[in-house]
Design a protein with these regions (language model features):
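Alpha-helical transmembrane segments of multi-pass integral membrane proteins
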Residues: 70-74, 99, 107, 111, ...
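Membrane-embedded helix boundary and interhelical linker motif in transport proteins
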Residues: 1, 91-94, 98-141, 186-206, ...
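Transmembrane helix-bundle core of multi-pass membrane transporters
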Residues: 162-240, 377-379
């Protein structure tokens, strides 16, 4: 215990020194992080195109194996969750510590509908989003007058309420045992299974390929990649619409919003509902990927990780969410074999980011709209 105490004090003193170094704005680390942030902020479109192209060819690179693809699918899932929460926290400025509840609602909605009615993934996916949006509105109404710490406490309680309901409502959710036998997604009706019945086609028989378990993994990778890109595209588009500008205005000054005719009630409910919808989509994907869901998959630590991704990436920054997800989830996976050190590595990574970049990796996001003078007239630039 004495050794660990001395080690903790040493690390703490080192971090304090790093913080002092940052305040004095000296040292190569602060310069490097500033240049990287500036490049990503001003060259974001080129960076995004390069990243998407790399993600498309990633499954076919020589070093990509099943483990790397599984980790990539996990990272993409957290990226999608981070983008969904970014609407609520980053754009609208509503601190939500119970976002995992919408993740759980989407997963259980998909699991119950698919196992009860036998509907396909493509039918159940939008329904999972609708149910999650309903719970988002259900949460939004009681917290309309709350902000800051009070809002965080209520949303935290909401997440725990959902988890406890899933544990105790045994007749519907099967309690802590969870739901098994959840159908896997198919490629336009072609299942990814080795043995097929007479007259039935599977993916490998239809395309005359040798059966491989990697086919399903690659399909799941592209599925979550498409869902994440849709989430990003929708967020980028909606933030330029009046409702998106209302979110950002609400984040900065709610009183000023009211004076300008913005309805805070509708604005908050819209943010909660849309953010919850994408959480529900991610939950549906999680359920079909695992083919099993249980309440232990939706604990508070999941909400904490998602919030950490949004905050550490930079409030309102889409690219920052990607970088923070890769960094934080990658750190925890590197220490998977050292279970007792995983959270230490996760916490250390968070501390280091907060020391060098207290406002997030990409804190200086460009405004949604800028006014520039052109031929003696003010014009809008998006």
């Amino acid at each position: 215990p004495v050794i660990f105490l001395v080690l903790a004090c040493t690390i703490g003193r080192f971090l304090i020194g790093l913080n002092s170094l940052r305040k004095k704005e000296i040292g190569f680390v602060s310069k490097i992080t500033s240049k990287v942030s500036y490049y990503l902020d001003n060259k974001g479109k080129h960076f995004a195109i390069t990243g998407v192209l790399f993600a498309v060819v990633f499954p076919f690179l020589p070093f990509t194996d099943r483990y790397i693809l599984d980790v990539s699918i996990m990272i993409l899932t957290y990226i999608m969750l981070g983008w969904g929460l970014n609407i609520v926290v980053g754009l609208a400025g509503l601190l939500d510590l119970g976002y995992v509840a919408f993740y759980a609602v989407g997963a259980y909605s998909y699991a119950l509908i698919a196992t009860t009615f036998g509907w396909s993934f493509w039918v159940c996916l939008p329904l999972a989003g609708v149910f999650a949006a309903f719970f988002g509105i259900l949460l939004g109404f009681p917290v309309l007058r709350l902000r800051g710490d009070y809002l965080a406490i209520v949303t935290l309680g909401f997440g725990e309420i959902i988890r406890i309901i899933l544990i105790n409502w045994y007749e519907v959710t099967n309690g802590p045992d969870g739901i098994t036998g959840i159908p896997r997604p198919t490629f336009f009706g072609l299942p990814f299974k080795k043995i097929v019945e007479d007259g039935e086609n599977s993916f490998h028989t239809f395309f005359n390929l040798e059966y491989s378990t990697m086919h399903r993994i690659i399909f799941l990778y592209y599925l979550i990649l498409i869902l994440a890109l849709i989430t990003n595209y929708f967020t980028l588009k909606i933030r330029k619409l009046p409702v998106g500008r209302a979110w950002e205005a609400l984040r900065e000054d709610e009183i000023a919003c009211k004076s300008l005719g913005v309805n805070p009630t509708n604005t908050k409910l819209t943010a909660f509902a849309i953010g919850a919808t994408f959480g529900g989509f991610a939950g549906a994907f999680f359920a079909t990927r695992q083919a099993f869901v249980s309440p232990e998959s939706f604990t508070f630590i999941e909400s904490a990780i998602i919030v950490a991704i949004v905050v550490l990436g930079g409030m309102g920054s889409q690219t920052g969410v990607v970088l923070a997800s890769i960094f934080l989830i990658g750190i925890t996976e590197m220490f998977r074999d050292l279970e007792q050190y995983r959270m230490i590595a996760f916490g250390g990574a968070m501390v280091l980011i907060m020391v060098f970049k207290p406002k997030g990796i990409l804190a200086n996001r460009k405004p949604t709209i800028t006014l520039r003078e052109h031929n003696s007239k003010w014009v809008k630039h998006y």
